């Protein structure tokens, strides 16, 4: 099996085998554009994203040292103590620890829910804590993230243009990055994954990975097309396609190397420790790394070829 994969990689590098990324550029870019449009429409059709309490605001309770960590017990206790409570979410965030989130409660309702959770899980009063999270905190995080995203894109455009000495690679790289972030967020909206500050951090981190993957491919393209004007053995499109195929195995291997530890963290965070910061961050990274690789291969490289082939 290993020898077969090694031979496959050698065949791609030598050009004996290849995938027609450049020849299929129109279809690939059209499909990518369709995915972006759908990713934008999904939250509109579904009525928005599944936002964490940091963004929507509300009351939060944490019950520690729980013997029976059944979330249904907590949900029933909350509904009975405060029937007016909206958007009730009870989750396991660690072994023996329950977190309950809901819309903002009054002082009397907060006391009633706290007592109900204490009785339902048979814990002491000091093992139940409550807090109120205002939506302004999440709004501030979102604003800072958007500002960071804009600066990231601007700096990437300038840096790529200077490094590769062509604005067309810069624009193509940004197209791949935008595809990555928009489709990742759209997938979150489609599946209903909760968007928390940790997920936002994961989204921004994925952009760095996607950019690295794109730079590797573009470096190979620049190497293959250097001095092509004085050569007659191949066309520009053929050399771009060869470069993408030569770096294909590396891109896939890099993705796998990144996904394996992130997947392990996701498994530990979700199945063993329950919902929480670890799960939110690793889920965003897991989804984003996969989409980021596709963005490089199916968007950035074909877009650059499309911009240059018309010259």
Where are these regions (language model features)?
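A structural signal for conserved, well-ordered secondary-structure elements
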Residues: 1-311
């Amino acid at each position: 099996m290993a020898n077969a994969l090694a031979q496959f990689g050698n065949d791609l590098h030598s050009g004996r085998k290849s995938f027609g990324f450049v020849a299929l550029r129109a279809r690939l870019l059209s499909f990518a554009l369709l995915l972006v449009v759908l990713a934008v429409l999904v939250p509109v059709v579904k009525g928005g994203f599944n936002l964490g309490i940091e963004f929507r605001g509300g009351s939060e309770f944490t019950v520690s040292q729980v013997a029976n960590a059944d979330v249904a017990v907590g949900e029933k206790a909350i509904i009975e103590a405060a029937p007016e409570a909206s958007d009730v979410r009870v989750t396991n965030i660690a072994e023996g620890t329950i977190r309950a989130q809901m819309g903002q409660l009054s002082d009397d309702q907060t006391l009633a829910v706290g007592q109900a959770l204490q009785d339902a899980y048979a814990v002491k009063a000091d093992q139940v804590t409550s807090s109120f999270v205002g939506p302004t905190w999440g709004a501030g995080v979102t604003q800072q993230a958007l500002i960071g995203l804009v600066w990231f894109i601007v700096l990437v455009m300038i840096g790529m243009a200077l490094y590769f000495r062509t604005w067309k690679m810069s624009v193509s790289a940004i197209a791949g990055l935008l595809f990555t972030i928009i489709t990742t967020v759209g997938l979150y909206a489609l599946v209903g994954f909760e968007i928390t500050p940790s997920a936002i951090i994961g989204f921004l981190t994925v952009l760095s990975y996607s950019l690295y993957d794109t730079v590797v491919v573009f470096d190979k393209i620049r190497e293959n097309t250097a001095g092509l004007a004085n050569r007659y053995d191949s066309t520009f499109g053929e050399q771009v396609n060869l470069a993408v195929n030569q770096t294909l195995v590396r891109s896939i291997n890099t993705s796998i190397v990144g996904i394996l530890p992130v997947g392990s963290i996701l498994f530990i965070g979700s199945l063993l420790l329950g919902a929480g910061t670890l799960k939110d961050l690793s889920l965003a990274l897991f989804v984003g790394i996969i989409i980021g690789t596709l963005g490089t291969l199916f968007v950035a490289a074909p877009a650059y070829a499309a911009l240059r082939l018309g010259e």
